[in-house]
Regions:
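Helix-rich catalytic cores of soluble enzyme domains
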Residues: 1-77, 81-109, 122-139
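Histidine kinase transmitter module recognition
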Residues: 110-111, 144
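Residue-level detector of short coil/turn "hinge" positions at structural boundaries
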Residues: 19, 61, 116-117, 152, ...
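Short acidic/histidine-rich active-site segments
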Residues: 114-125, 151-157
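Catalytic-core signal marking the mid-to-C-terminal active-site face
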Residues: 136-219
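Active-site lining segments that contact anionic ligands and/or coordinate catalytic metals
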Residues: 23-27, 77-81, 115-117, 176-179, ...
Length: 219
């Protein structure tokens, strides 16, 4: 995702579009897995790394923005816009209302990770077209986090947690190394044309299905 975003930044800034405008127009879409703490750390790491990538383009504040950093860069441009969607990988056909617990936990981890918006998958999506009831529940799941748990009132609520902070750093380091390897190979577009990206995704998907089949991973 970072390499993809950087490809847009590189192509458009080379075409003469100001870096601040490009960065503010890019929005990332992420899936949310059932690994609660890992997902919180994942979103935190993504925001950290994207801010570093954007900063390398030295984005200048536009006329309607005066949020400048220490070196005069536009800090608004470095903010990562993130939309997240709960997974369908772990949803069950049997006792389907248990899916509400799964999607709620995933939505909670995304909210704590700092996403801007999210889509909660209706609990019955795996076996039928969601009806009005299941769609209303899906909408209300995230509203409960906002209106009753007040998750939108605290900036980075996971900050200071020893476990999550260390997990964030670990994910950021691994993601950054992967990002650098893609860039050294010519960038995301080159990797996409060569089929490297698709091959990596397919291999990861195959490994996960195998882990579930061998009961080494719990859904």
């Amino acid at each position: 995702a970072l390499a993809w975003g950087n490809e847009y930044m590189s192509q458009l800034t080379d075409a003469g579009v100001p870096a601040a405008i490009v960065a503010k127009k890019i929005k990332f879409n992420f899936g949310i897995s059932s690994n609660y703490f890992l997902e919180i750390a994942k979103f935190r790491a993504a925001r950290l790394l994207w801010a570093n990538i954007v900063a390398s383009y030295n984005p200048e504040c536009l006329r309607d923005c005066d949020n400048k950093g220490a070196n005069g860069e536009c800090r608004c441009a470095a903010k990562m816009a993130v939309h997240a969607e709960t997974s369908t990988f772990n949803l069950t056909l049997f006792d389907a209302h248990v899916n509400l617990l799964r999607t709620q936990t995933e939505a909670m981890s995304a909210a704590l990770g700092g996403v801007d918006s999210m889509t909660v998958t209706p609990f019955d999506k795996t076996y039928e077209t969601p009806d009005e009831f299941s769609e209303r529940l899906a909408r209300n799941q995230q509203l409960l986090l906002k209106e009753e748990s007040h998750f939108d009132k605290v900036i980075d609520p996971a900050a200071g947690s020893y476990y999550i902070e260390n997990l964030t750093i670990s994910i950021a380091q691994q993601a950054w190394n992967l990002f650098l390897s893609v860039e050294e190979a010519g960038g995301f577009y080159v990797a996409l044309k060569a089929g490297t990206v698709q091959a990596a995704v397919n291999e990861s998907n195959k490994a996960r299905h195998k882990a579930v089949a061998q009961r080494r991973e719990v859904l």
